[in-house]
Structures are given as C-alpha cells and as structure tokens.
C-alpha cells in the first residue's frame, strides 16, 4: 500500500484544496475546506485584492446575510492589498449587510487589506500576535497624454482624501495624522495596530 504522506505533500505542492468528509445518518457528504468554513460563517480574503476576489467576498457576504441576517460574519484577511475600486466594493458591502462583519488579520494586512481590516465592526477587529499591518496612500501609475495624467492625478488625490477620512472614522485618529502616517509605507505590529485603532484585540487564542 502506498504511503499517504507523499500524496499529501504532492497535494499541497500543487495547491490543491483539501476536502472534508462529514458522516451523518444520511450518509457521507464532502466539502472543500473553504465551503465547510463558509458554513461556520468564515470568509477568507487571501492574496491580491482585485475584481475576482472582491466578487467572491461580496457574494459570500450577501449569501451569509440571506442565511441569517442576525449572526456575525468573520472575514479572515491575509493580503498585500491591491485595487482600490475592488476593495471599496468589499468595504461598501461590509457596511451594507445587516450582520456585523468581524475582521481578523493572519499574516499580513497591507494597503487595502489594512483598510478592510480596520473597517470591521467596532470591538470585533482582531490580529494574530505575529501579524503585520501596513498602511499607505493609494499608488498611481498614470500614463498617456498630459491631460489624461492630470485627470488620473485628480482621481488619485480624491481617493487618497476619501480613504484618509474613512480610516480616520474607523480608527479614531484625526485626518491630518492619517495623512502624515500614510505618506509612506507604515508597517506596524499587532500591538502597534491596536494602539493606532486599526484593530481592537490581539488574539493569542480563540475566545
């Protein structure tokens, strides 16, 4: 009989999603691990924030709201950030749905990832002890004619101001400090992020 260990290692190396098998009186039912955790109202946002990941997160938030509008949803974040527009789609949906959306950073929440981490329900924003959080201003990469660059520059300045005001709202910091602190990449430990108001708790163990 072949050893199971090499097969498990091969599955991990290929990036395959583990399958969970549950047995009940009705027989066996298999789920991929993320679908099983979705039943526990846990949503993952891992990797770059883009239109695809935003669509997946938004769809799961809306589905869980339809399942039970009064039970909290947990959003687990490990993301270097990405598209502002995609991130704002997630942000607006988090504020739109009726259940509180709790956020938890595992690994890294940077840029839009940090913004979404801070946007969780007040008192329900967490980070694991060795997680890192990074805030900065929106990045621009304008190209084209001078008039096009001017239009894009105005849009970036608008987004910067809008994000600063929202981050000030969620952290309790004043907008001027947010503007200063996001002028360059600003990395924080979990404890620093808590002191800044980006999260409420550093979690070493599940409550």
Swiss-Prot record:
Its EC number is 3.4.21.92. One of its GO terms (cellular component) is cytoplasm. GO terms for molecular function: ATP-dependent peptidase activity; ATPase binding; serine-type endopeptidase activity. It catalyses: Hydrolysis of proteins to small peptides in the presence of ATP and magnesium. alpha-casein is the usual test substrate. In the absence of ATP, only oligopeptides shorter than five residues are hydrolyzed (such as succinyl-Leu-Tyr-|-NHMec, and Leu-Tyr-Leu-|-Tyr-Trp, in which cleavage of the -Tyr-|-Leu- and -Tyr-|-Trp bonds also occurs). The keyword Hydrolase applies. Keywords: Cytoplasm, Hydrolase, Protease, Serine protease. The keyword Signal does not apply. CDD domains: S14_ClpP_2. Signal peptide: none annotated. Fourteen ClpP subunits assemble into 2 heptameric rings which stack back to back to give a disk-like structure with a central cavity, resembling the structure of eukaryotic proteasomes. Belongs to the peptidase S14 family. This is ATP-dependent Clp protease proteolytic subunit. The lineage of its organism: Bacteria, Pseudomonadati, Pseudomonadota, Betaproteobacteria, Burkholderiales.
